[in-house]
């Protein structure tokens, strides 16, 4: 049975900020990223790697261990900014991610 009420989907986003050498890799200082099909930081890195080839390897070289010369921090509404050290860290709508 179809609904008589219109269905609307509200797209979810994470907001990305780039600093230092990451701005050189992306050519940007910030952007919004749709979270459609994205659940973890690993998913975000994979999506950004398609857009900016080599991006994922800047943060997680082959072997799956985060690079100690770069970093990713997440800021959630009402919570302190925290570093991400687990590629399975879940990303939420409205998260602000800082890549350096």
Regions found by a protein language model. Give the residues of each.
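Ubiquitin-like/PB1-type beta-grasp interaction modules and other compact soluble beta-rich domains
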Residues: 1-100
């Amino acid at each position: 049975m179809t609904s008589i009420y219109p269905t609307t989907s509200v797209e979810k986003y994470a907001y990305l900020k780039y600093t230092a050498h990451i701005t050189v890799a992306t050519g940007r200082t910030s952007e919004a990223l749709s979270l459609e099909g994205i659940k973890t930081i690993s998913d975000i890195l994979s999506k950004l790697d398609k857009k900016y080839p080599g991006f994922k390897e800047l943060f997680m070289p082959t072997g799956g261990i985060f690079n100690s010369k770069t970093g990713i921090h997440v800021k959630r509404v009402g919570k302190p900014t925290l570093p991400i050290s687990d590629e399975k860290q879940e990303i939420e709508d409205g998260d602000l991610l800082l890549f350096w």
